[in-house]
Swiss-Prot record:
This is Nucleoside diphosphate kinase. The gene is ndk. NCBIfam families: PRK00668.1. It comes from Roseiflexus castenholzii (strain DSM 13941 / HLO8). CDD domains: NDPk_I. Its cofactor is Mg(2+). GO terms for cellular component: cytoplasm. GO terms for molecular function: ATP binding; metal ion binding; nucleoside diphosphate kinase activity.
């Protein structure tokens, strides 16, 4: 099964949106196999967002993601990358559909609440950047039989 890294960014934490966002993820049937509250330091932020280095918004992105605590989680499931991305909505909240996390809770692109892996390859890379193998739990739920064939 695919794995996706999700980061509830400092604005999501400060606005008290951890519970509502985690509820949506769990209600969709995705398995949370790793979860932690942490403060991302500048070195980790630069590694995570290395693809954006040199872009005009890079410095403000690093300042934002390191400005307060975040909740980082790993979710698994069939087609998890695509599912999570559709739940999250467009990067620009102004273009995010109602019913998505950003469409319902975010207002501007610079404070868009949540990061989600954009490909299976990046999902694996990001999971390994933020979690050690022993921090992840291979959890099976009793409800899985009602979610997966």
């Amino acid at each position: 099964m695919e794995r996706s890294l999700i980061i509830l960014k400092p604005d999501a934490v400060q606005r008290g949106l951890i519970g509502p966002i985690l509820t949506r993820i769990e209600q969709r049937g995705l398995r949370i196999v790793g979860l932690k509250l942490m403060q991302i330091d500048e070195a980790l932020a630069r590694r995570h967002y290395a693809i954006h280095e040199g872009k005009p918004f890079f410095d403000s992105l690093i300042a934002y993601i390191t400005s307060g605590p975040v909740v980082v989680l790993v979710v698994t499931g069939a087609n998890v990358i695509e599912m999570v991305r559709s739940m999250v909505g467009a990067t620009n909240p102004g273009k995010a559909a109602p019913g998505t996390i950003r469409g319902d809770f975010a207002l501007e692109i610079g404070r868009n609440l949540i990061h989600a892996s954009d490909s299976p390859e990046n999902g694996e890379m990001e999971v390994n950047l933020f979690f050690r193998a022993e921090e992840l739990v291979d959890m099976r739920r009793s409800t899985d039989q009602w979610i997966y064939e």
